[in-house]
């Protein structure tokens, strides 16, 4: 109902007629509502001063837009530090980039919601990105899907997931008989995928603490985003081989 407020509609009409920049002065509490209204007619990139402000604004916008808004986090580390960014951060960044692609190129076969609004702190936007990351897609599994069970560990390893005996953190996966436990990079809980031969019969979430499935938390599909922004793709292997060959020709 708030989005149909006459005063808000007047602001939105002015915004739609603006040819260049438009400055809107409002109280802080009204900003999420105004942004949600603007998002009904055009995709938005909302820039905040800090990550904390960005996370808070994303939560407020979600009350109006649901899954149509996401926060684009920045790395917790500098590009040349030995420390790697957390798997959660990497997964969320790749998820946002993928969902932006879905907004431009809808895919009826993809169950993931496209984005209307991306919220990002200024720091997130000044960190350089590989151009190929915009085309990174998740590995999606769904109930009744048939997939070569023997190839699944290889696929997950290629997405920088680590095979372990017991899943405990994001990026882990374990194989026991016809069951595969995976902790997706962007998920709150890990998932347990049961196979009947090469067919997926069940997908359930489970708790890390006791490894038991969570009641009434069955899923019809699950998406695994990569755990690293640097993946050994075929193109990357060719470039590495070419670089190695070039370096072998250099004599010091």
Predicted features and spans:
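ASCE RecA-like P-loop NTPase motor cores
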Residues: 1-250
């Amino acid at each position: 109902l708030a989005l149909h407020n006459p005063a808000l509609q007047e602001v939105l009409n002015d915004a739609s007629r603006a040819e260049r920049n438009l400055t809107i002065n409002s109280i802080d509490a009204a900003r999420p509502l105004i942004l949600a209204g603007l998002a009904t007619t055009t995709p938005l990139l909302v820039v905040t001063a800090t990550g904390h402000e960005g996370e808070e604004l994303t939560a407020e916008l979600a009350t109006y837009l649901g899954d149509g808004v996401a926060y684009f986090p920045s790395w917790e580390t500098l590009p040349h530090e030995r420390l790697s960014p957390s798997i959660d951060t990497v997964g969320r960044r790749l998820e946002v980039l993928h969902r932006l692609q879905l907004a431009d190129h809808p895919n009826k076969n993809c169950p993931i919601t496209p984005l209307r609004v991306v919220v990002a702190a200024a720091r997130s936007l000044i960190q350089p990105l590989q151009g190929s990351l915009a085309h990174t897609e998740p590995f999606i599994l769904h109930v009744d899907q048939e997939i070569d069970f023997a190839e699944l560990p290889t696929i997950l390893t290629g997405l920088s997931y680590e095979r372990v005996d017991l899943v405990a953190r994001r990026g882990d996966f374990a194989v026991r008989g016809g069951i595969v436990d995976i902790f997706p990079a962007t998920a709150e809980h890990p998932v347990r995928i049961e196979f009947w031969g090469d067919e997926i019969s069940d997908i359930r979430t489970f708790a890390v603490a006791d490894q038991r499935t969570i009641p009434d938390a069955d899923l019809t599909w699950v998406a695994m985003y990569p755990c690293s922004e640097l993946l050994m793709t075929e193109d990357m292997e060719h470039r590495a081989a070419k670089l190695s060959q070039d370096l072998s020709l250099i004599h010091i």
